[in-house]
Amino acid sequence: MSLTTAEQLRACHVRRWHIVQVAREQTLAEHSFAVAVIAGSLAAAMRWTGLMQNNLQLKLLQWSLSHDIIEVRTGDTPTPFKRVLEQAGGKGVFEKAEDLVDSDYAGAYRQIRGTDIEVIVKLADQIEAIYFLQDNGIGAHAIRVLDGLREILSKMVNDIEKDYPHLNVREGVRKVCQDIEIHGGWL
């Protein structure tokens, strides 16, 4: 069943970061917008050739804005719990659950899986999490989470460089992180 327009608009109210202390709430809509901005900047910094094709530009924008839209029905499932679900139910259990919640969303994800678009949006999603928590995280737990997010981004860059050598991943991520003042020698 597809999400209705009214359900999609609830992204303005779905909250993120509910297991990390933050100075202010972030909504799914704010996160999705920031991911779209970062994904566009990242694609340009990587010199992604898809930017020369209107249909791929549109797909990048659409997926950036909707990559987490299922959360208007599920809420923002914390990443640590996603890992527990995978341990309990096996690899792909979270995707199977999302398919039950909204098969159209799951179908959209299957269409971009393994593409440059998926890679760019995943990197943008990770960068956005670091960006938000760097500015809004409070306390020792938030610092540990932020350190973990940076480690994950570094590993993602290393892995993606191997699997997608045509993308200038490290250069692109460095440029975007520098531009939005995410600091660290972890890349």
Residue ranges and their predicted role:
Residues 68-100:
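Acidic, Mg2+-coordinating active-site segments of isoprenoid diphosphate-utilizing enzymes
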Residues 37-43, 58-77, 122:
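Active-site alpha-helical segments that house and flank conserved acidic catalytic motifs
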Residues 159-187:
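Charged phosphate-binding loop/patch that engages nucleotide di/tri-phosphates or the phosphate backbone
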Residues 23-60:
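Alpha-helical phosphate/pyrophosphate-handling elements in metalloenzyme active cores
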Residues 58-62, 102-144:
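Histidine/acidic-rich helix-loop-helix segments that form or flank divalent-metal centers
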Residues 1-19:
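Short alpha-helical hairpin
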Residues 39-40, 94-111, 152-159:
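Histidine- and acidic-residue-rich, metal-dependent catalytic cores
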Residues 22-32, 82-94, 118:
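Active-site metal-coordination segments of metallo-dependent hydrolases
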